[in-house]
Amino acid sequence: MVSPEVLERDRSAHLPSWPIVLLIVGLAALYLATQGWRDRHLFLINATESLPNWAFVVERGTSPVRGKLAFFVVPRTPLIVAHFGKEPQPFGKTVYGMPGDIVTRADNWVSVNGARVAHLKALSKRGEPLAPGPLGRVPQDCYFMGSPHPDGFDSRYADIGWVCDKQIVGTGTTVL
């Protein structure tokens, strides 16, 4: 006959210890909590020189704010496909112009509400012609996006143009 102490010892040898159970429950809770975060955020790496930072967290579905970073889907024009591929990653730029703002150009300088924001180049680094972007009042639900970099590819050029709400992925925060 087997003593009750031996039976209890054998049974407890096959049961997980409380710290292991708590660790598994904690990891499951962390996983479920990050699911919601992941559905609302992206982590993007900048592969160009147009912004000084190279890593961003993007909060999906948030509206652009003047002076802040916003990320958007670009049109698939021949120039964009030639430089960024058939499925380019979202572009990140600073919001320079909001709906109703006025965009003008003089001596290849682009201004928003009279403040210079970007210099216009005639040719890309590869020698392709760059058509100037739109001028006038920024339409409702659209934005003028830019970067301080002289080779920035943004709303100053027709291939990007106005960036409208349907293109917006979200707003970004620099990480690195």
PLM regions and their residue ranges:
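Protein maturation boundaries and topogenic segments
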Residues: 1-90, 158-176
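Acidic/glycine-rich C-terminal interaction modules and beta/coil loop segments
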Residues: 6-8, 123-172
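A short, sequence-level motif marking secondary-structure junctions
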Residues: 62-63, 119-127
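Residue "hotspots" at secondary-structure boundaries inside conserved domains
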Residues: 62-63, 95, 101, 136, ...
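Structural motif
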Residues: 67-70, 101, 142
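Mid-length scaffold segments of soluble, non-membrane domains
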Residues: 86-117
